[in-house]
Amino acid sequence: MTTLNPYFGEFGGMYVPQILMPALKQLEEAFVSAQLDPEFQAEFQDLLKNYAGRPTALTLCQNLTKGTKTKLYLKREDLLHGGAHKTNQVLGQALLAKRMGKTEIIAETGAGQHGVASALACALLGLKCRIYMGAKDIERQSPNVFRMRLMGAEVIPVHSGSSTLKDACNEALRDWSGSYETAHYMLGTAAGPHPYPTIVREFQRMIGEETKAQMLAREGRLPDAVLACIGGGSNAIGMFADFIDEPGVGLIGVEPAGLGIETGQHGAPLKHGKVGIYFGMKSPMMQTSDGQIEESYSISAGLDFPSVGPQHAYLNSIGRADYVSVTDDEALDAFKALSCNEGIIPALESSHALAHALKMIKAEPEKEQILVVNLSGRGDKDIFTVHDILKARGEI
């Protein structure tokens, strides 16, 4: 029996080998007690404020919306220590690991941002850290790989399958199956077996809480919509959580359409996948007609994931959130537009959410509306990827 509900409607659950059930139960119990422990909460809040740099800014775009009646705000998770929203929840999970008496952290990473966040939290709190990363992603994200190693983490290349995030997830779970007595698996997104989707949401929900308070202070009202990119879905659920019960606020999640949905080269399982069991949960995923997990694709390593967190699947099923998709090229255009017009270089992941916001503004330039894009990370890690693409096109 679990203390918390392991499902969001029909989605979620704990589809793991029996050997891992005690570890998940221990984690749930530690999380529930920590949420009620003022000392734990005070330590977590202190780290968020004085180490990570919260609250993060809410920035009004001065130039991107000229000639329209839209106010476009960016929630600046790119300013967080570590460069992305990932730092929020790893600090919480690292404190939980210490509370459970664990001495080691296992993590997986795609774009490398969760790996960097895990490495910095472990360095700070004195935990050993080993990080599984697809060999293809190691090539795409060499600056982040060096950052992880610089902070003392062991980075383990994964060559199986497509050598990307899903394969790193599989290897990390395999490792944890044999080491859970001393190691905590620091899952990087709001997916996987219960209680991870709930833990990650709660350790990210300050994004939306701060946004709500900042909007009321700046505008005297809530935004018309908040937008966030969707890979596994942690930055989005962190933004959405505090707005779910605000019916006047639209929730828009943006999946990667890659080379185009019609090509099959995408990472948009919410709208174009089928429900199945993968990575310890029941959720929509990209799969073949005979049920094999299909390879996802995105220009952005952090969105290159064939499934999605179960709470997003639920919000989609009840119509509370809208999920759309944006192609590589549209994300690249948004990446360039924000860099050129506002002096902010966004992560390619975040550029997907920005691209859809810009499409909304272009479609109705006379509409008076306030939009907030969760700028989930900074684009330093992506400049080499973007440089190579633009050079190949003759644009630079």
Curated annotation (Swiss-Prot):
Its cofactor is pyridoxal 5'-phosphate. Keywords: Amino-acid biosynthesis, Aromatic amino acid biosynthesis, Lyase, Pyridoxal phosphate, Tryptophan biosynthesis. It catalyses: (1S,2R)-1-C-(indol-3-yl)glycerol 3-phosphate + L-serine = D-glyceraldehyde 3-phosphate + L-tryptophan + H2O. The keyword Transmembrane helix does not apply. The keyword Amino-acid biosynthesis applies. Pathway: Amino-acid biosynthesis; L-tryptophan biosynthesis; L-tryptophan from chorismate: step 5/5. The modification N6-(pyridoxal phosphate)lysine is found at K86. GO terms for cellular component: cytoplasm. Tetramer of two alpha and two beta chains. This is Tryptophan synthase beta chain. It comes from Yersinia enterocolitica serotype O:8 / biotype 1B (strain NCTC 13174 / 8081). The lineage of its organism: Bacteria, Pseudomonadati, Pseudomonadota, Gammaproteobacteria, Enterobacterales. The gene is trpB.
